């Protein structure tokens, strides 16, 4: 990628069908972990008109009223009106949940003579960049903030005619590798049927777009697409089927970094798809926060049942202050990338996952997002032989 380029990322609201599914899956995970931190959980959710289906594998001593929990999540998201076509009181809740395969458990569980292994093979990436205050790419950061603002003005009745389903997309222009302008903004939001499109466009511009995007990035040629197809009354699970794990680029870096392919929601931290991706973010963010690179991407890989990663590699895109081989050595010295080690380091055996299931797993400032800490930055600078700021 050259130093001058255009880049676009998208996000979706908590009321988008796929995000409803992610939040239900993680709500179930949290409810189980609250009672049984060592549980093995892999829960998938499907949502469609009048229906929520849970399926997967769970091994636990906990008991959860999944029907009540599903209805609570759907209600909190904002599907509380039968006129929308999907609501918390009338939707059916179906479950098809079994136990984790003993063949998998044999390799993952910790015994006296067996260290906890990875829950599956796979490759995971972590990424950070110094272009925003949260060390995330600007396009995905502001795409998230747009749909977060949509939910805020909907729930606080600033724009009471908004409905839960929404999508955003932001196109940034980069020069010398840094974001300098917004070239296009797309905001599609579900709404009540009796609102004029002109009123929707004006309100979205004032209460959402101008509220979120820094004015210095907006210019006379910035293009705005607000509900570009016109009416957006039919939305949510009525308009589209929703499934857990279908928004993995929204969940991570908006396409700016590579992705190993594994989804996060509904998975307990023994699944390295989730926990190692969180650790990858933690490592990359601390490298950037330490000033060892302006951009950093780390890849780790695992074999099922094996504790040690099968590989660790780092790319700094020409922005590193020390060699990438040295960075890998520092990572091996200061971060425990074995499944048990990263679970312990990030304190992942807690009911902290539902908030991750909307508006991105990374770049968040809530205290439960332990992988967003930069507490290793000074240690890395010192180990690299650089003065501590």
Curated annotation (Swiss-Prot):
Question: What are the EC numbers?
Answer: 2.5.1.6
Any Gene Ontology biological process = S-adenosylmethionine biosynthetic process
Specify where the region named Flexible loop lies, as residue ranges.
100-110
The residues listed in the UniProt record as binding L-methionine, with positions renumbered to this chain, are: 57, 100, 240, 271
Keyword match Transit peptide:
no
Name the cofactor(s). Answer: Mg(2+); K(+)
Q: Which domain of life is it from?
A: Bacteria
Q: Which residues form a coiled coil?
A: none
Q: What are this entry's molecular-function GO terms?
A: ATP binding; magnesium ion binding; methionine adenosyltransferase activity
Annotated residues for binding of Mg(2+): 18
- Enzyme class comes to transferase
User: Which key words tag this protein in UniProt?
Assistant: ATP-binding, Cytoplasm, Magnesium, Metal-binding, Nucleotide-binding, One-carbon metabolism, Potassium, Transferase
- Positions binding ATP in this chain are 16, 165-167, 240, 246-247, 263, 267
Q: Which positions bind K(+)?
A: 44
- Reactions that this protein is recorded to catalyse: L-methionine + ATP + H2O = S-adenosyl-L-methionine + phosphate + diphosphate
Q: Does the keyword ATP-binding apply?
A: yes
Q: According to its UniProt record, where is this protein located? A: Cytoplasm
Give the record's pathway: Amino-acid biosynthesis; S-adenosyl-L-methionine biosynthesis; S-adenosyl-L-methionine from L-methionine: step 1/1
- Role noted for this protein: Catalyzes the formation of S-adenosylmethionine (AdoMet) from methionine and ATP. The overall synthetic reaction is composed of two sequential steps, AdoMet formation and the subsequent tripolyphosphate hydrolysis which occurs prior to release of AdoMet from the enzyme.
What is the name listed in the Swiss-Prot or TrEMBL entry for this protein? S-adenosylmethionine synthase
User: Which gene is the coding source of this polypeptide chain?
Assistant: metK
């Amino acid at each position: 990628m050259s130093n001058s380029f255009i880049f676009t990322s998208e996000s979706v609201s908590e009321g988008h069908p796929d995000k409803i599914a992610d939040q239900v899956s993680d709500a179930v995970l949290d409810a189980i972990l609250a009672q049984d931190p060592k549980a093995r959980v892999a829960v998938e959710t499907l949502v469609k008109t009048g229906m929520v289906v849970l399926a997967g594998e769970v091994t636990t001593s906990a008991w959860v009223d999944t029907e009540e929990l599903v209805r609570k999540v759907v209600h909190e998201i904002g599907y509380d009106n039968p006129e929308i076509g999907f609501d918390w009181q009338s939707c059916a809740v179906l479950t098809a949940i079994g136990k984790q395969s003993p063949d998998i458990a044999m390799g993952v569980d910790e015994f006296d003579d067996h260290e906890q292994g990875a829950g599956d093979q796979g490759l995971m990436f972590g990424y950070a960049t110094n272009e925003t205050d949260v060390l995330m790419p600007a396009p995905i950061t502001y795409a998230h903030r747009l749909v977060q603002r949509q939910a805020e003005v909907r729930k606080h009745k600033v724009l009471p005619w908004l409905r839960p389903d929404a999508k955003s997309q932001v196109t940034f222009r980069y020069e010398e590798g840094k974001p300098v302008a917004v070239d296009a903004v797309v905001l599609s939001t579900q709404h009540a049927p009796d609102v004029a499109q002109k009123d929707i466009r004006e309100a979205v511009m004032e209460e959402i777009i101008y509220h979120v995007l820094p004015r210095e990035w907006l210019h006379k040629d910035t293009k705005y697409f607000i509900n570009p197809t016109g009416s957006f009354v039919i939305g949510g699970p009525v308009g589209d089927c929703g499934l857990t794990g279908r928004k993995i680029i929204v969940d991570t870096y908006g396409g700016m970094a590579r992705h190993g392919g594994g989804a996060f929601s509904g998975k307990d931290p023994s699944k390295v798809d989730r926990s190692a991706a969180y650790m990858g973010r933690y490592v990359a963010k601390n490298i950037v926060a330490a000033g060892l690179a302006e951009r950093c991407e780390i890849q780790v890989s695992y074999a099922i049942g094996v504790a040690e990663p099968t590989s660790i590699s780092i790319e700094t895109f020409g922005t590193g202050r020390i060699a990438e081989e040295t960075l890998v050595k520092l990572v091996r010295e200061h971060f425990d990338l074995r499944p048990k080690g990263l679970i312990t380091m990030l304190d992942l055996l807690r009911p902290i996952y539902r908030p991750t299931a909307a508006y991105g797993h990374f770049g968040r400032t809530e205290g439960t997002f332990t992988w967003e800490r930069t507490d290793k930055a000074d240690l890395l600078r010192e180990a690299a032989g650089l003065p501590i700021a």
